[in-house]
Amino acid sequence: MTKTRLAAEDRIAWVRVASCYLPLATPISDAKVLTGRQKPMTEIAILFAEIETADGHQGLGFSYSKRAGGPGQFAHAKEIAPALIGEDPSDIARLWDKLAWAGASVGRSGLSTQAIGAFDVALWDLKAKRA
């Protein structure tokens, strides 16, 4: 007889984050560029978060940053990722709060929430695949 663990008993075993840049074929300009406040956007930084549970369930999430913040977003994600290890991947709202508190000194907006967003999408992906 095979024993199957309940989803609530499964735990996050590992988390991986990666970042890459998507170059734009044509730089994008807007009013901020026309007024001289910013340069044209030439690339988009994409943050990926991959989560796997002890039972082998996987979720993949992403977030992005335009013009600035990509390296900071990645650094923040790397710093808070270990807070997910050993946690119940189904308790997504609680994990959002835990990650927000893990990086509270950075703030609760901008690159902080963009970094958390990649984990959030990965957790929802994992939950959907498990359903």
Which sequence ranges carry the predicted segments?
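Intrinsically disordered, low-complexity boundary segments flanking structured domains
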Residues: 1-6, 82-86
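Metal- or metallocofactor-binding catalytic centers and their adjacent structured scaffolds
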Residues: 14, 52-131
